[in-house]
């Protein structure tokens, strides 16, 4: 009988490029590919250690002199909606949720383009065409859903979230919505609705991506109770956002080789840095 040993994930580091969150900073990412057998287990394990997924790549910040970007997740059991968040839920009661397999549609792309053009025209995704959008949605080696929110009155697609289903929660990979409805707080609404989905499914967490102190576009995440950030190799409740700073320092981040050595992988594999 022949046994095939699991292939150890290879970890790489991107070249530095301008940080999209903090002006004047440079970002760098540590990443690996999701391929072969065991991708679900690898995705689950690394998501619990601050990694995020983009198509078939898992990555997390590994900046040389800055550690401001921290993965964030909401503990469903510890979440209590504020009065404002309850109003947001009520304001969007006319939206119907539908979770589908990861398949891109023309309606999704039209909404996606409208969202980018009006909210993130200078962002790194601003030039994505329909084929690149389809790849973002459909090229997933793990269990992924497209969660669509449709207006019951007009039948218009109003918001979309590309969501991964993990063993311990839901990961909101990317979300977008009608930019002409700021009063509806659709971004906040989708997070609130995912908390409810996770609660109904018995999943303890909703992963939100990164929280960055000092970044205005990321500040809304700190408004959710039960928020935890991945800091110093462990998940820490964010009780006082002001206690975290975005200051940079050459000793803020451990050497890449040390970061890779400390990554915990599914049983039977060990990380390798290339």
From Swiss-Prot:
Q: Which GO terms describe its cellular component?
A: cytoplasm
Its catalytic activity?
Answer: N-terminal L-glutamyl-[protein] + L-leucyl-tRNA(Leu) = N-terminal L-leucyl-L-glutamyl-[protein] + tRNA(Leu) + H(+); N-terminal L-aspartyl-[protein] + L-leucyl-tRNA(Leu) = N-terminal L-leucyl-L-aspartyl-[protein] + tRNA(Leu) + H(+)
- Pfam families in alphabetical order: ATE_C, ATE_N
Q: Which top-level group of life is the source organism from?
A: Bacteria
The Gene Ontology terms for molecular function here are:
arginyl-tRNA--protein transferase activity; leucyl-tRNA--protein transferase activity
The record's subcellular location field reads:
Cytoplasm
- GO biological process, alphabetically ordered: ubiquitin-dependent protein catabolic process via the N-end rule pathway
Q: What Enzyme Commission number does this protein have?
A: 2.3.2.29
| Transmembrane segments annotated in the record for this chain | none
Record key words, sorted: Acyltransferase, Cytoplasm, Transferase
Q: Its family?
A: Belongs to the R-transferase family. Bpt subfamily.
- Give a short account of what the protein does: Functions in the N-end rule pathway of protein degradation where it conjugates Leu from its aminoacyl-tRNA to the N-termini of proteins containing an N-terminal aspartate or glutamate.
The record's section on PANTHER family has:
ARGININE-TRNA-PROTEIN TRANSFERASE 1 (PTHR21367), ARGINYL-TRNA--PROTEIN TRANSFERASE 1 (PTHR21367:SF1)
Q: What's the protein called, per UniProt? A: Aspartate/glutamate leucyltransferase
The beginning of the lineage is:
Bacteria, Pseudomonadati, Pseudomonadota, Alphaproteobacteria, Rhodobacterales
